[in-house]
Design a protein with these regions (language model features):
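Membrane-embedded alpha-helical bundles of multi-pass enzymes
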Residues: 2-221, 437, 451, 463-465, ...
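Soluble catalytic domains of enzymes that build or remodel membrane lipids, polysaccharides, and related
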Residues: 220-510
Length: 536
C-alpha cells in the first residue's frame, strides 16, 4: 500500500477512535493543567500524596494518538507547570536561574511524552511495563546528568505513605516511582479500553497486584524493623538570618547563640550534639580565636560536637571546602569531612571559562569551593549505659556515622557508600534559609526519608532554619525542632534516641540495579521503535 494512502487510513482511524473516546479524553486542553495541578498537590506543602497515583492520567490521555512532536510539546508544558509549582522557591536565589532550571527539568517530561505516546496507544500489556520504565529511566538520568538534580522525584510524593515506600530498601526511590507510574498507566489504559472488558480486567488486575505485593512487604517490614543499640543525639537549630551569617559584626552574637542552645541541648544528656551547615561564622581551623570558642563550647558540655564550617587548605593554590568537623568531648578535633558533591552555580561554576557570565546574574557571589576527596566516617567512643540492648557491649563503644552536607542527601549512591563503609547512622546538616519560608525544606527532607529506608539507618537532620528532625529506619519523622507550633524559622533544640544498625539492605549492596533494568527496557523500546520505522 502506498505511504500516502496508509497515512490517510491512519488519520481516519484516529478520527473514528476520538469520536468514541470518553468525554474526559476528548476535552484535551484541560488535561495538561489538570496533570500538573494533581502532581503539585501531591508534594509539600499540600502533601496530598494519593493524587500522584492519578496525576499522570490526564497527560497520558492528552498525548494518546498525538504525533510525536505534539506529544513532546504537551508533556513539556506539563513539566513547566509542574516544576513552576514545586521549585518556585529558587526565585529567592535567582529569578533567571529558576526559569532556566524549570525549562531544563521540563525537558524530561517532554522526552517522556515523546517516547511513550506510541506505547500509550498500544493494546498489548507491554505499555504497562514500558511507560513506568521510561519514566524511571528519565528520573535516573535527571538525577545524574550535569552533576544531577534528583529533586521532586515521583517517589518523593509518597514520603508520608510509609507502607508503600518500604520497597525502597530493595529498589530504591526509583522502585516507588515505577509503582506509582504503573498505576497511572493502568488507569489510563482502562479508560482507553473501557469498551473492551478483557483489557480492563488485565491492566487493573496487574497494577493492583503490584500494589498489593508492595503493601504486603511494607506492612511486614514495618513490623520487623532491625534492632540495635541506642544513642541519644541532639540537634541545634540556630535560625541565623542570611544577612547576619557572614557579617563579622554579628560573629560574637552568633557564637553566643549557639553556645546557649548547646548548653540547653546538653541538659538532655545526649551522646552527640549537631550544629547545622556552615553554622560556624568563619574559618574554624584557620582562626585561632574562633576555634578556641567553639572548642570551649564542646569541652564545657562534655559531649562530642559536630559543626558545619568553611575550611581552607593552604598551599600553592588555596582550596576552600564546605566541611563538617567533629570535636571530642575534650574539645579536640577528631575528624573532618569535606563535601564531596558540590552544588553547581552555588558552590562553584562548572566550566568556568564558558559560564563565567552566570555570576553577573546571581544575587550573591557564587562560591569557589573545592570537592572533597574522602568518604569520611566519623568515629567517637561513648561509655556503655542502661540504654544498651547489647549485654556484650564493652565499657567503651565506638560509634560510627557519616555526614551529608546540604543537598548531598538527594544522592542515594553517596548515602549508600557511607553505609557500606560502616556508618551506623547518617547526618544531614544543611542551611535552607536561602529559600525563605517555602516548601523547599520539607521537599528537601523527603530525600532524607528515602535515604533512611533504602539503607535502614536513622537519619538526623540539623538545619539552620529548619527542618531539623529525626528520621527512623521506617522513614518516619519521629521528632523535630518545634517552637509554638512552628518548625521553620525558629530557634531551638531537640534530642531523641536513635538506633544504631549494622544491617546491609539489598539496595545498600546493589544500588540502583532496578533503575538500570528500567533503562534497559526503555532503551530496547526506543531502539525497537526506530528500527520499526526504519523498516516501514
Amino acid at each position: 500500500m502506498p505511504v500516502r494512502e496508509r497515512k490517510k487510513i491512519q488519520k481516519m482511524l484516529r478520527q473514528i477512535n476520538a469520536r468514541h473516546q470518553p468525554p474526559a479524553i476528548r476535552h484535551k486542553p484541560i488535561l495538561i493543567p489538570a496533570s500538573a495541578f494533581f502532581l503539585i498537590l501531591s508534594f509539600p506543602n499540600f502533601n496530598l500524596w494519593f493524587l500522584a497515583w492519578i496525576g499522570f492520567v490526564p497527560l497520558l490521555c492528552a498525548i494518546d494518538g498525538k504525533k510525536p512532536i505534539e506529544a513532546f510539546a504537551l508533556s513539556y508544558l506539563t513539566g513547566v507547570l509542574f516544576f513552576l509549582g514545586t521549585v518556585y522557591w529558587l526565585v529567592h536565589v535567582t529569578l533567571p536561574g529558576m526559569i532556566a532550571v524549570v525549562l531544563y527539568l521540563a525537558l524530561y517530561f517532554g522526552i517522556f511524552g515523546l517516547v511513550v505516546s506510541s506505547a500509550a496507544g498500544r493494546k498489548s500489556p507491554v505499555a504497562l511495563l514500558v511507560i513506568p520504565a521510561v519514566w524511571v529511566a528519565l528520573e535516573w538520568v535527571r538525577a545524574h546528568l550535569f552533576t544531577g538534580f534528583g529533586w521532586a522525584l515521583l517517589a518523593h510524593s509518597q514520603s508520608y505513605n510509609l507502607p508503600i515506600i518500604q520497597i525502597a530498601d530493595m529498589a530504591g526511590a526509583y522502585g516507588v516511582s515505577f509503582l506509582v507510574m504503573a498505576v497511572n498507566a493502568a488507569i489510563f489504559m482502562t479508560i482507553r479500553q473501557i469498551r473492551n472488558k478483557n483489557y480492563y480486567t488485565y491492566y487493573m488486575a496487574a497494577a493492583l497486584f503490584l500494589v498489593f505485593l508492595s503493601l504486603a512487604y511494607g506492612v511486614f517490614r514495618l513490623k520487623n524493623i532491625f534492632a540495635g543499640d541506642m544513642l541519644k543525639v541532639a540537634v541545634v537549630q540556630g535560625n541565623i538570618p542570611q544577612t547576619k551569617k557572614w557579617d563579622r559584626n554579628y560573629r560574637a552574637e552568633i557564637v553566643g547563640k549557639y553556645a546557649a542552645l548547646t548548653l540547653e541541648a546538653s541538659k538532655e544528656k545526649p551522646d552527640l550534639i549537631i550544629w547545622p551547615e556552615t553554622s560556624v561564622p568563619g574559618f574554624l581551623e584557620s582562626e585561632r580565636d574562633l576555634f578556641g570558642k567553639v572548642a570551649g563550647i564542646s569541652k564545657s558540655v562534655g559531649v562530642p560536637l559536630l559543626v558545619g564550617t568553611p575550611s581552607i587548605a593552604r598551599g600553592e593554590k588555596d582550596s576552600l571546602y564546605n566541611s563538617a568537623v567533629l570535636f571530642g568531648d575534650g574539645g579536640r578535633v577528631l575528624e573532618r569531612y569535606d563535601k564531596l558533591h558540590l552544588v553547581p552555580f552555588g558552590e562553584y561554576v562548572p566550566l568556568k571559562e564558558l559560564f563565567s557570565f552566570v555570576e553577573k546574574f546571581a544575587p550573591m557571589p557564587i562560591g569557589d569551593f573545592s570537592r572533597g576527596t574522602a568518604y569520611t566516617v566519623f568515629k567517637f567512643f561513648i561509655e556503655r549505659d542502661s540504654r544498651s540492648k547489647d549485654a556484650n557491649w564493652h565499657m567503651l563503644k565506638k560509634v560510627r556515622f557519616s555526614c551529608l552536607i546540604c543537598f548531598e542527601d538527594i544522592f542515594p549512591e553517596l548515602a549508600s557508600e557511607f553505609v557500606r563503609k560502616d556508618a551506623l547512622f547518617l547526618v544531614n546538616i544543611t542551611n535552607d534559609a536561602w529559600f525563605g519560608n517555602t516548601s523547599a525544606p520539607y521537599q528537601h527532607a523527603q530525600s532524607s526519608v528515602f535515604r533512611a529506608v533504602e539503607n535502614r539507618v536513622n537519619v538526623v537532620r540539623a538545619a539552620n532554619t529548619g527542618l531539623s528532625c529525626f528520621i527512623d529506619q521506617k522513614g518516619m519523622i519521629t521528632a523535630k525542632v518545634c517552637r509554638a507550633g512552628k518548625d521553620l524559622f525558629v530557634d531551638g533544640v531537640a534530642a531523641h534516641d536513635i538506633v544504631l544498625t549494622k544491617t546491609r539492605t539489598f539496595y545498600t549492596v546493589y544500588g540502583d540495579i532496578f533503575a538500570y533494568c528500567c533503562m534497559v527496557i526503555a532503551l530496547a523500546y526506543v531502539v525497537g521503535i526506530i528500527v520499526k520505522r526504519g523498516v516501514s
